[in-house]
Amino acid sequence: MALLPDKEKLLRNFLRCANWEEKYLYIIELGQRLPELRDEDRSPQNSIQGCQSQVWIVMRQNAQGIIELQGDSDAAIVKGLIAVVFILYDQMTPQDIVNFDVRPWFEKMALTQHLTPSRSQGLEAMIRAIRAKAAALS
């Protein structure tokens, strides 16, 4: 995830945006930085239910026990939200992910207040799916 900022820089960059149009553009830019997802990873078992857009999230545990996340969506803003979630969960073990509450970060960014209800529900579905997969690994 070298192309993505860390949590603190994400928050700083987000708060520097002058308005919500700039913030949406920044979210879309983050999504464009995600590595390309392989075709074989766009499978039903990696599909996230509860999102209006098509969303795939792949979770693998490396030799050090750290979770590595990959994902994609057919919608630019949703792909950016995937990147935001991946930044928040970067370098975590399965147990870290289960214990980590992303909501304070979303509140600092005022993120959920400016998403449509369907995007907010999709974001919650992504987080639930990642936490459930992490719980199964921990």
Curated annotation (Swiss-Prot):
Predominant place of localization: cytoplasm
Catalytic residues, chain numbering: 51
Up-regulation conditions: Suf operon is under both the Fe-dependent Fur repressor and the oxidative stress dependent OxyR activator.
GO molecular function: enzyme activator activity; sulfur carrier activity
InterPro entries per UniProt: Cysteine_desulfuration_SufE, Fe-S_metab-assoc_dom
A GO biological process held by the record: sulfur compound metabolic process
Gene3D superfamilies: 3.90.1010.10
Keyword Cytoplasm: yes
Protein name, UniProt field: Cysteine desulfuration protein SufE
Organism: Escherichia coli (strain K12)
